[in-house]
Amino acid sequence: ELFVVEWLRRHAPSRYAVRGQDKVEFRMGHVVSINIDITVEDLETGQTAFVLDTKYKAAEQPAASDIEQVVAYAEAKGCTQAALVYPVELGRPVSGMWGADIYVRSLAFGLGGNLEEAGRNLLEQLQLWGETGA
C-alpha cells in the first residue's frame, strides 16, 4: 500500500494530490472512523477523484465484501470512481457501475516485474478512466 501511494505521489499529474490512510469520521452517537487506503484529490475541483483500496493477495476475482468496502469508501468521500488494486492481474476482473453513480473496477500494480512499467500502467488506467469518465 505504501509503495503504491508513494509511486502515485511521485508520478501523478500535478493536478492530483495523493493521500494514504485518509481518515473519515462519522458521528453516530459516538465517533466511527474508517481509513481509506488511498484517495486521489483533484486540486482543480477540490473533489476526491478516486478512492483506491489495495489488496495484498492475488485472487481470481474480487470478493463481494471488498467491492462493498471500496463502495463505502467512495460514498464517504462523495466520489464516483472506486478501484481495488491487486498485485497481479485478476482472472476475472470487475468493471462496472455500482448503483447509479459509483464506477468500480479492479486494477493491477504488478509487483513481480518492472515496477516503473507497472506503475505507469496503473496511472494510465486511472488517467484514462478519470479523464474520459470510464
Regions found by a protein language model. Give the residues of each.
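Catalytic core segments in nucleotide and nucleic-acid processing enzymes
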Residues: 1-134
